[in-house]
């Protein structure tokens, strides 16, 4: 966690504006995260946000949040995938196993993902994240070791389905990574990568019943599985998450502010 009380000692925006005509902030984590700070730190962060010339946010709902909070220009910052540049091997074969998107804490919604993943009657795997808790290894989940992103992407391509019932909406990289490989992913609405790339597999927050229904449909209906697989890959190719589409989008934003 950022040591915010140390930042309070500096005129951060003033110092930055000595170096640049425009100062821009990019969201990291959920938009409500600063509200877990001490009261004086919350006020400091709010005042700091209002001093930026422009903000970038993860999701459409985050754009609305920061626009309302700051009255500053806010744009969506898509997570850019540089898979080809980094040597990611596209999916060409896969096994009968499920990948859930996080550990057993509220932040990741790992327990909800585990419940939904059980519907497939397949081995369940999970990445090891920073919030992994004691005794997780005692569950019938195979935890992968900590990996670089390239190692993660080349490992992910072998899995049948992704399940990511994460209530904390931020950059949405798990669902995005799945879409790159054409892996159907069940998850919550409100996360742009989920809604945009896996529209047939997006459910309302907390709707485990619908998520389990979709899991069984993917399991039993091969045509539905193939539709979800091809759809997410096709939507990824058309999205702002690819370098081809991202570059003109972000260039236009910067040209307008400079």
Label the predicted regions.
Residues 157-170, 183:
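Acidic donor-binding loop of glycosyltransferase active sites
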Residues 53-67, 71-87:
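Donor nucleotide-sugar binding/catalytic pocket of nucleotide-sugar-dependent glycosyltransferases
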Residues 148-159, 180:
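Short acidic alpha-helix that forms the nucleotide-activated donor recognition element
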Residues 153, 175-181, 194:
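Short alpha-helical segment that forms part of, or immediately flanks, the ligand-binding pocket
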Residues 83-137, 143-149:
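Conserved catalytic-core segment of nucleotide-activated headgroup transferases in glycan assembly
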Residues 220-256:
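A charged, aromatic-enriched C-terminal amphipathic alpha-helix characteristic of glycosyltransferases
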Residues 1-66:
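Extended catalytic core of nucleotide-activated donor transferases of GT-like folds
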């Amino acid at each position: 966690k950022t040591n915010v009380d140390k930042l309070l000692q500096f005129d951060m925006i003033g110092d930055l504006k000595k170096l640049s005509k425009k100062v821009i902030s990019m969201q990291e984590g959920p938009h409500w995260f600063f509200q877990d700070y001490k009261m004086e730190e919350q006020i400091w962060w709010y005042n700091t946000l209002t001093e930026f010339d422009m903000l970038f946010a993860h999701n459409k709902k985050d754009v609305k949040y920061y626009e309302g909070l700051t009255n500053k220009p806010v744009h969506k910052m898509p997570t850019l995938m540089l898979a080809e540049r980094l040597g990611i091997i596209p999916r060409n074969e896969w096994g009968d196993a499920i990948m859930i998107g996080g550990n057993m804490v509220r932040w990741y919604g790992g327990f909800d993902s585990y419940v939904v993943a059980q519907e497939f009657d397949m081995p369940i795997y999970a990445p090891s994240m920073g919030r992994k808790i004691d005794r997780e290894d005692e569950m019938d989940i195979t935890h992968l070791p900590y990996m670089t992103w390239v190692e993660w992407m080349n490992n992910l391509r072998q899995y049948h389905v992704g399940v990511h019932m994460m209530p904390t909406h931020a950059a949405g990289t798990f669902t995005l990574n799945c879409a790159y490989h054409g892996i159907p992913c069940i998850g919550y609405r409100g996360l742009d990568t989920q809604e945009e790339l896996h529209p047939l597999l997006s459910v309302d927050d907390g709707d485990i019943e619908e998520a389990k229904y979709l899991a069984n449909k993917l399991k039993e209906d091969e045509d539905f599985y193939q539709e979800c697989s091809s759809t997410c890959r096709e939507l990824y190719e058309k999205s702002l998450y690819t370098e081809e589409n991202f570059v003109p989008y972000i260039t236009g934003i910067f040209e307008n502010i400079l």
